[in-house]
Each structure stands twice: as C-alpha cells, then as structure tokens.
Amino acid sequence: NLWQFGRENQEVMGQHLPFHYLSYGCYCGWGGIEPKCCYVHDCCYGKLDLYTYSKETGDLVCGGDDPCQKQLCECDRVAALCFQDNKDTYDQKPYNAENCQEASEAC
C-alpha cells in the first residue's frame, strides 16, 4: 500500500516520498515520463496487499510467505531504489503533464 511504499522510500531516501512525487514528471500520480520509477510502480500495482519487509545491512528485504505480498513488496522496493538512484535530478517544482509528448507505454 502507499503507506508501506512511503516507509520503504524513507528507508532508502531519508524522507517519506510518495506525496512529493504525486505531480512529478509524466507518470507520477496514478496513470501518470521521467523518472520511470512511477510508471514501473503503477504497472506493478495494477497487477497485484500488505506485506512485510526489513532493512538488513543497508538493503531492503521483502519477507513473508505469500508470493503475492512478496511481489508487491518487490514493486515498492524497486521503485524506492529507483528514486534513490535518481535523487540528484529530482526537481521539487511540479511538472505540467501537458508537456508530456510521449504516450504511456504498455505495462
């Protein structure tokens, strides 16, 4: 869920990010080009509940026995790490989606 996604981002970025990215780029916000972190995350959520994770020696580790919960956790983990990898290019100013020229890719 979005709260857990925010917690994972907080673990790797030091801040609770989901709301910072709601109007960022062409993909952030449901259905919303760069970074594609949001796009990949939206596609993943569209295919999949609460899950467990931990931070072990600096890495996020998805836990639990349910394969669907692990898959959802992995969606959040990959997006959180994508945001971490792209944090140097993050611009806090909202990006007008009208500037997006490309159509959204199929998941």
From Swiss-Prot:
UniProtKB keywords: Calcium, Disulfide bond, Hydrolase, Lipid degradation, Lipid metabolism, Metal-binding, Secreted, Toxin
GO cellular component: extracellular region
SUPFAM superfamilies on file: Phospholipase A2, PLA2 (SSF48619)
Cofactor note text: Binds 1 Ca(2+) ion.
Residues annotated as binding Ca(2+): Y27, G29, G31, D42
EC number: 3.1.1.4
Molecular function, one GO term: calcium-dependent phospholipase A2 activity
Required co-factors: Ca(2+)
Disulfide bonds: C26-C100, C28-C38, C37-C82, C43-C107, C44-C75, C62-C73
Primary enzyme class: hydrolase
Tissue note: Expressed by the venom gland.
One GO term of the biological process aspect: lipid catabolic process
PANTHER family referenced in this protein's UniProt entry, alphabetically: BASIC PHOSPHOLIPASE A2 PA-11-LIKE, PHOSPHOLIPASE A2 FAMILY MEMBER
Family label: Belongs to the phospholipase A2 family. Group II subfamily. D49 sub-subfamily.
Protein name per UniProt: Acidic phospholipase A2 2
The organism of origin for this protein: Bothrops insularis (Golden lancehead)
